[in-house]
């Protein structure tokens, strides 16, 4: 994009993009996305750098040591003059509000939260699962909990639940034990547990008590995380936005949304829940324009252009 907010190219590159510690950084994949979007603007990577500022909002940038590590890795490719790295949660927050501060919550495969105060102070969480004290941490957890509930209902350790039937049906087997065995023998990728999250919401909508209990646990962890950030930044008496982004928030479960709203408003009555309806890349682009001190008209133009411009060359 240009500093006046014109979109010069847009690409969705569906490839391996895990920058978590201990993984081989997917720099070639990221470079391919940059090459393709630059080509739309008539720029080749041979004429590096391709931009003045590169704003990278990446999953896996969870700790300060991650920020330093990934920044070094990206700078080593010389794609842009100035590398700015953020966790993807900051893109969610910026895409959902023009205040410049507030709270952003991402709930997809995992759960994370970042908050910015009106004075610029930042609160973020490691979001490393059980390792960092997270409890009901996102859609991956919800899927695993669904399998656990199905197994416990079947063997008598827990209450009966419609998940006993719905979980194995999703994977085209007859018993939840078969799903467990497939995971144990690595015949089934553990990442596929995320596919069960919509099943839990469907079961809860049908009146399944155990599914509703799991959804309530997830909502309560979202509330606890957001409220911790709100208290730490002393936002409890202020008016601000809480932006909710990620696949879990695209469900249509009114009780889930209401529980989150009521739980946060109990601590911060002036908080307004906003479900993100724009792609997170809008937030990354706006953060880039913020860094360039672009005019408000440029930011408004960017929002409008990205809203009407499909992300090209989907893969």
Predicted regions and their residues:
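Conserved helix-loop-beta element of the AMP-binding
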Residues: 53-55
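Solvent-exposed beta-strand sheet faces enriched in polar/charged residues
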Residues: 57, 86, 241-245
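ATP-binding/phosphotransfer module of carbohydrate and carboxylate kinases, centering on a glycine-rich
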Residues: 1-45, 49-51, 75-76, 95-101, ...
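Alpha-helical substrate-recognition element adjacent to the catalytic core
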Residues: 29, 57-62
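Phosphate-binding/catalytic loop of phosphoryl-transfer enzymes
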Residues: 61-165, 311-315
């Amino acid at each position: 994009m240009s500093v006046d907010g014109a979109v010069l190219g847009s690409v969705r590159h569906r490839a391996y993009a895990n920058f978590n510690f201990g993984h081989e950084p997917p720099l070639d994949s990221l470079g391919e996305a940059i090459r393709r979007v630059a080509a739309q603007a008539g720029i080749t990577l041979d004429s590096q750098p391709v931009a003045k500022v590169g704003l990278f909002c990446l999953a896996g940038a969870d700790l300060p040591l991650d920020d330093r590590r990934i920044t070094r890795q990206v700078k080593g490719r010389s794609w842009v003059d100035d590398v700015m790295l953020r966790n993807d949660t900051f893109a969610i927050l910026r895409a959902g509000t023009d205040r410049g501060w507030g709270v952003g919550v991402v709930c997809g495969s995992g759960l994370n939260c970042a908050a910015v105060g009106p004075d610029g102070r930042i609160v973020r969480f490691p979001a490393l699962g059980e390792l960092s004290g997270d409890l009901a941490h996102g859609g991956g957890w919800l899927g695993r909990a669904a399998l656990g509930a199905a197994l416990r209902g079947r063997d008598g350790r827990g209450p009966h639940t419609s998940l006993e039937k719905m979980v194995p049906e999703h994977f085209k087997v007859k018993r939840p034990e078969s799903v467990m065995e497939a995971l144990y023998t690595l015949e089934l990728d553990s990442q596929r547990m995320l596919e069960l999250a919509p099943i839990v919401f469907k079961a809860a909508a049908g009146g399944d008590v155990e599914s509703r209990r799991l959804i309530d646990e997830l909502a309560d962890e979202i509330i606890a995380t957001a409220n911790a950030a709100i208290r730490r930044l002393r936002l409890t008496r202020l008016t601000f936005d809480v932006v909710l982004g990620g696949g879990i928030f695209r469900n249509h479960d009114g009780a889930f949304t209401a529980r989150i709203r009521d739980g946060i408003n109990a601590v911060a009555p002036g908080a307004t829940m906003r479900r993100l309806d724009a792609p997170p890349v809008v937030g990354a682009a706006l953060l880039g324009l913020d860094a360039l001190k672009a005019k408000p008209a440029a930011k408004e133009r960017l929002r409008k252009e990205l809203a009407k411009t499909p992300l090209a060359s989907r893969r």
